[in-house]
């Protein structure tokens, strides 16, 4: 639910991006999980029945938030989405986001981001090519940090798209298989969502998921 260790302190302050429109994310096929970590820091609305959500945030946010819709149990299936995302002056991600239970890991497939690339301050694992672009791949270790089990120490995995986009198909298996060469469990999944995260600035996003 947070970024790299080097920026952990930022996550305790504010989260936002430039602010025109609300964030709408939709995936009508089997949506059964609402990710709402500090969604009260902005204007977060959702409708599970249609697979849509919106998030709008302004300057002055006091902490990190992660909001989105998805599934209680993740998988390597592909996700197709389209989005409107405005976060150029915010530390923010538009990403496939989830957790693995054991070995515990937090993961992001970052399709677009604001003013902060998480791989700029993490350990590089190289690159992987998927869905028409190279992705930078990196990892970090969070120590005594908030997690799905309370406070724990766990590994983060990031794939950050070099040719950023706000629509397309994410072939999740390509990332999971690459990460698995570097300790990623690739099984025993916890939840998985299409998410928006931010911790400063102001912004908005709208996403429709169809897979």
From Swiss-Prot:
Task: Domain (GH11): give its ranges.
Answer: 19-210
Enzyme nomenclature, EC number: 3.2.1.8
Q: Which residues form the signal peptide?
A: 1-16
Q: Which InterPro entries match?
A: ConA-like_dom_sf, GH11/12, GH11_AS_1, GH11_dom, Glyco_hydro_11
Q: Does the keyword Acetylation apply?
A: no
GO CC, any one term: extracellular region
The answer, when asked if Secreted is one of the entry's keywords, is yes
This chain's protein is named Probable endo-1,4-beta-xylanase 5
Which species is the source of this protein? Aspergillus niger (strain ATCC MYA-4892 / CBS 513.88 / FGSC A1513)
Task: Please state the gene responsible for encoding this protein.
Answer: XYN5
């Amino acid at each position: 639910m947070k970024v790299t260790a080097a920026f952990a302190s930022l996550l305790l302050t504010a989260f936002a991006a430039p602010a025109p429109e609300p964030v709408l994310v939709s995936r009508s096929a089997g949506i059964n999980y609402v990710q709402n970590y500090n969604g009260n820091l902005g204007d977060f609305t959702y409708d599970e029945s249609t697979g849509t959500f919106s998030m709008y945030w302004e300057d002055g946010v006091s902490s990190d938030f992660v909001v989105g819709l998805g599934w209680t149990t993740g998988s390597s299936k592909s996700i197709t989405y389209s989005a409107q995302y405005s976060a150029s002056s915010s530390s923010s991600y538009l990403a496939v986001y989830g957790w693995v239970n054991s070995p515990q890991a937090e993961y992001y497939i970052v399709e677009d981001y604001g003013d902060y690339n998480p791989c700029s301050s993490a350990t590089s694992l190289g690159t992987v090519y998927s869905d028409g672009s190279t992705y930078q791949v990196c990892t970090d270790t969070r120590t005594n940090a908030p997690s799905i089990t309370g406070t724990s120490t766990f590994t983060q995995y990031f794939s950050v798209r070099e040719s950023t986009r706000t629509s397309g198909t994410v072939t999740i298996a390509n990332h999971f298989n690459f990460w698995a060469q570097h300790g990623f469990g690739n099984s025993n999944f916890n939840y998985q969502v299409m998410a928006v995260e931010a911790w400063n600035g102001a912004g908005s996003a709208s996403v429709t998921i169809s897979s």
